[in-house]
UniProtKB/Swiss-Prot annotation:
Glycosylation sites: 320
Compartment(s) of residence: Virion membrane
Protein name according to UniProt: Large envelope protein
Species of the source: Hepatitis B virus genotype A3 (isolate Cameroon/CMR711/1994) (HBV-A)
Topology Virion surface: residue spans: 2-181, 275-348, 399-400
Function: The large envelope protein exists in two topological conformations, one which is termed 'external' or Le-HBsAg and the other 'internal' or Li-HBsAg. In its external conformation the protein attaches the virus to cell receptors and thereby initiating infection. This interaction determines the species specificity and liver tropism. This attachment induces virion internalization predominantly through caveolin-mediated endocytosis. The large envelope protein also assures fusion between virion membrane and endosomal membrane. The middle envelope protein plays an important role in the budding of the virion. It is involved in the induction of budding in a nucleocapsid independent way. In this process the majority of envelope proteins bud to form subviral lipoprotein particles of 22 nm of diameter that do not contain a nucleocapsid.
Keywords: Acetylation, Caveolin-mediated endocytosis of virus by host, Fusion of virus membrane with host endosomal membrane, Fusion of virus membrane with host membrane, Glycoprotein, Host-virus interaction, Lipoprotein, Membrane, Myristate, Transmembrane, Transmembrane helix, Viral attachment to host cell, Viral envelope protein, Viral penetration into host cytoplasm, Virion, Virus endocytosis by host, Virus entry into host cell
Gene name of this polypeptide: S
Compositional bias per record (Polar residues), positions renumbered to this chain: 96-106
C-alpha cells in the first residue's frame, strides 16, 4: 500500500497546484525550472514541495483575472506582479516648498488706470468732443466737404493728436495684406515660367512638323546616317552632334526662331497701327511728294504742335499746300493698301468682293463655320505649335 502514488494524467488544464480556469497552461512537470527529472517526475505530488499558498488568492496578477503566478510573472517579483495589490498613500510636499519649482502663478493684473493711463485720459467721450471742434473738423474735412468751414487746427490740438498717434503707433499689417503682397509676384513668376517652358517647345514642334512634310505617311528617320559615322535610328529632330544631320537641324531651328520673331514683330506693328500710334501719311493720288512738317499756307490749317502730326501737307508747284488728315487708326495699313493699289491695279477689283463678303447672310457664315469645323482637326495639327504664342499676343494687346 505504501507504494508509489499513481501518476496523474498529462495534458492541458491538469495543473492541480494553481487554479486554471482557462485551461491552456501546461503542467509544471514539463518545465525543467521546477525540478522535474527521473527521480522526481511528478512535481505536483511531491510532499516536500512548497504549496504556494499565495496561488490560491485571487487578485490582480500579470496573466489576467482568476490566476496569479506564485513565483512572479513577466512583470517581475514586485507585490503587484505577485498578485498583492498594495496602495501607498502619496504624501504631498510641504507647503513651503510646494511652489519653489515649476511654473509660478500668474499675478493679478493691475487696474487699467495704473497700467494704461493714456487710455483713461483719452476715452471715447473726450474723443468725440474733440472731433466736434471746428478746428479738428477742418483737419479731417477740407474745403468743399461736409464741414461748415475749414479752419487750421490749433497747435495744441495738433500736438496732442500727434502725441496720441506716436503713443499708439501704426496699425500692425494684417495677414491678408502680407498674403496678397506675396501671392501676386508668385503667380506672375509661375505664369512666366509656364510660358517659358511652352515657348521652348515651339521650335521642336515646328521642326517636327517641318520634317514630317518630307515623310508623308512614313515615320521620319534621319537621312544623315552613313557608314562613315554610324548612329542608331533616331528622329531628325533629335540628331546627336556626331550625326551629319545635326547641322541641318540647327539650321532649321534658327530659321524657325527668326520666323517666330517676325510673327511677334508683325503682331506688334498691327497693334500699334490699330491704336493710331503709327502716324503714316497716306499717298495722295497723282502726287508722290508728301511732307509731315507744318505748312505755312494750306487750304486746311495744319496742327503741327501735337506729338503726332494730324495732317500731311503736299507742296505742288504753284506754292500752295494741300493738307490731308492722317487716319486716327490703321494709317499704316491704309498706306500699304494705297501703295499696293498704285503698283498693282488689279487689287482695286477685290474691293467689291471684300465688301460683298462682309455683307453676307448668316447662312453663308454658318456654312463657313461648318467648313472650318470639318477641316478643324487638320488645321489644329498645323496650328498647334503656334498656340503658346497666343498668351504673348494677348499680353501685348492688353498692356500696349
Amino acid at each position: 500500500m505504501g507504494g508509489r502514488l499513481p501518476k496523474p494524467r498529462k495534458g492541458m488544464g491538469t495543473n492541480l497546484s494553481v487554479p486554471n480556469p482557462l485551461g491552456f497552461f501546461p503542467d509544471h512537470q514539463l518545465d525543467p525550472a521546477f525540478g522535474a527529472n527521473s527521480n522526481n517526475p511528478d512535481w505536483d505530488f511531491n510532499p516536500i514541495k512548497d504549496h504556494w499558498p499565495q496561488a490560491n488568492q485571487v487578485g490582480v496578477g500579470a496573466f489576467g483575472p482568476g490566476f496569479t503566478p506564485p513565483h512572479g510573472g513577466v512583470l517581475g517579483w514586485s507585490p503587484q506582479a505577485q498578485g498583492t495589490l498594495t496602495t501607498v498613500p502619496a504624501v504631498p510636499p510641504p507647503a513651503s516648498t510646494n511652489r519653489q519649482s515649476g511654473r509660478q502663478p500668474t499675478p493679478i493684473s493691475p487696474p487699467l488706470r495704473d497700467s494704461h493711463p493714456q487710455a483713461m485720459q483719452w476715452n471715447s467721450t473726450k474723443f468725440h468732443q474733440t472731433l466736434q471742434d471746428p478746428r479738428v473738423r477742418g483737419l479731417y474735412f477740407p474745403a468743399g466737404g461736409s464741414s461748415s468751414g475749414t479752419v487750421n487746427p490749433a497747435p495744441n490740438i495738433a500736438s496732442h493728436i500727434s502725441s496720441i498717434s506716436s503713443r499708439i503707433g501704426d496699425p500692425a499689417p494684417t495677414m491678408e495684406n502680407i498674403t496678397s503682397g506675396f501671392l501676386g509676384p508668385l503667380l506672375v513668376l509661375q505664369a512666366g515660367f509656364f510660358l517659358l517652358t511652352r515657348i521652348l517647345t515651339i521650335p521642336q514642334s515646328l521642326d517636327s512638323w517641318w520634317t514630317s512634310l518630307n515623310f508623308l505617311g512614313e515615320a521620319p528617320v534621319c537621312l544623315g546616317q552613313n557608314s562613315q559615322s554610324p548612329t542608331s535610328n533616331h528622329s531628325p529632330t533629335s540628331c546627336p552632334p556626331i550625326c551629319p544631320g545635326y547641322r541641318w537641324m540647327c539650321l532649321r531651328r534658327f530659321i524657325i526662331f527668326l520666323f517666330i520673331l517676325l510673327l511677334c514683330l508683325i503682331f506688334l506693328l498691327v497693334l500699334l497701327d490699330c491704336q493710331g500710334m503709327l502716324p503714316v501719311c497716306p499717298l495722295i493720288p497723282g502726287s508722290t511728294t508728301t511732307s509731315t512738317g507744318p505748312c505755312r499756307t494750306c487750304t486746311t490749317p495744319a496742327q503741327g504742335n501735337s506729338m503726332f502730326p494730324s495732317c500731311c501737307c503736299t507742296k505742288p508747284t504753284d506754292g500752295n499746300c494741300t493738307c490731308i488728315p492722317i487716319p486716327s487708326s490703321w494709317a499704316f495699313a491704309k498706306y500699304l493698301w494705297e501703295w499696293a493699289s498704285v503698283r498693282f491695279s488689279w487689287l482695286s477689283l477685290l474691293v467689291p468682293f471684300v465688301q460683298w463678303f462682309v455683307g453676307l447672310s448668316p447662312t453663308v457664315w454658318l456654312s463657313v463655320i461648318w467648313m472650318m469645323w470639318y477641316w478643324g482637326p487638320s488645321l489644329y495639327n498645323i496650328l498647334s505649335p503656334f498656340i503658346p504664342l497666343l498668351p504673348i499676343f494677348f499680353c501685348l494687346w492688353v498692356y500696349i
